[in-house]
Amino acid sequence: MKKIIITATFLLVGGLIFAQDSAKDKSAIDAQIDAIIYSWNNHNYDDLKNYTTENTDWVNVVGMWWKGRKQSQYAHQVYHNTIFKTSVGEKKSVAIRFVTKDVAIAHVEWHFYGGDTLPDGTPPRTKDNPNIDLATLVFVKQKGKWLLEAGQNVHVVPEAQQFDPVKQMPKN
């Protein structure tokens, strides 16, 4: 009986410690997401090295795939010197889950508006009618710091949401 109580105590304490670490890690990842948005809103990506790995990949909403920190920084900066130079990004929601203790996936809904007319003639979005985007971000913990390893951003098309088959999926 004593062994059962000791084992149960260790499991309970271990679970509490993991929960505390998990909350701390979620907070650290959320802070890195804020850093990404800070770069966007300041239109300066000199700080990209503070929240990405050297091998970070980014796939943007039109399928451009930037491989490594150098390409990611360069491409983001080019667009923020041109069509996004006055755009604004706002984080709306974040869902984080851990794949391992050192790998996490974050799904971020963020809204973007402002900027210049796009190359195809599309006028900039307004705060009342922003682009609604959903990003999938993969973070890895390196030397105690959470860094973006890969990200992909897609536009959410509100008109298509009614056709999501999951909305008709049986509940049981």
Residue spans for each PLM region:
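Hydrophobic pocket/interface hotspot
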Residues: I36, D47-K49, T56, G68, ...
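Short, low-complexity N-terminal intrinsically disordered segments enriched in polar/charged residues
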Residues: I17-N50, E54, K167-N172
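Low-complexity, intrinsically disordered terminal/linker segments enriched in charged
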Residues: D120-G121, V140-K143, L147-N172
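A mature extracytoplasmic/lumenal domain signature
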Residues: T52, V62, V108-F112, Q152-N153
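Bacterial Sec-dependent N-terminal signal peptides
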Residues: M1-A23
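A short gly/proline-enriched turn/hairpin at secondary-structure junctions
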Residues: D57-K70, H80-K85
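Membrane-spanning beta-strands of outer-membrane beta-barrel proteins
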Residues: G89, N131-I132
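Surface-exposed, charged secondary-structure patches
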Residues: Y74-R125, N172
